[in-house]
């Protein structure tokens, strides 16, 4: 199987954005995590979704609950779809590795997006996370369970995924002053996702 884009996976989403929006699971397997986080947020909270795609279903969940959200994605096609879906919401065309909004948020989500970054790029993201989080803010992200790379077909394109080892994520979180609130491996109630929830404690 021919391998594709490794460094900038968002370029693949520029090709398959419409397919992805139509075929992404719509059964809200993330619901339990979103419900948990919603209970931790005030009505004045601000949410940043890194790799927001077309905004469904995660940003849509918070929008429907009256929470102020900002979506970031490096794929032009995904941002275009997001703006169509939620015209009153702020969306930014930016690479999550290379931006600074000069804003603080109560929650940062990198759900099924962080793991599209090469392993060498992932450690620096924890600086981005803490730069954009308020004290006691929540970080929610998904990862693999061991260091390595995986390729998977989506919309006729071979999509790159990468992960560090679980111990490496634990070390990075601790070094950047995050307290792990929960870590579920291959959560059967969430499509087999490996889900981290941590709180920034500067």
Region locations from a protein language model:
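Short "lid" loop at the C-terminus of a central beta-strand within the Rossmann-like core
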Residues: 144-149
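Class I SAM-dependent methyltransferase SAM/SAH-binding core
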Residues: 48, 54-98
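A short glycine-rich, Lys/Arg-flanked "PGG" loop and its adjoining helix->strand segment in the class I
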Residues: 123-135
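Acceptor-substrate binding/catalytic loop of class I
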Residues: 151-168
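Conserved beta-strand signature within the Rossmann-like core of class I S-adenosyl-L-methionine
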Residues: 136-143
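Conserved class I S-adenosyl-L-methionine
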Residues: 1-42
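Core SAM-dependent methyltransferase catalytic element
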Residues: 185-202
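A conserved beta-strand element that flanks and buttresses the S-adenosyl-L-methionine
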Residues: 109-110
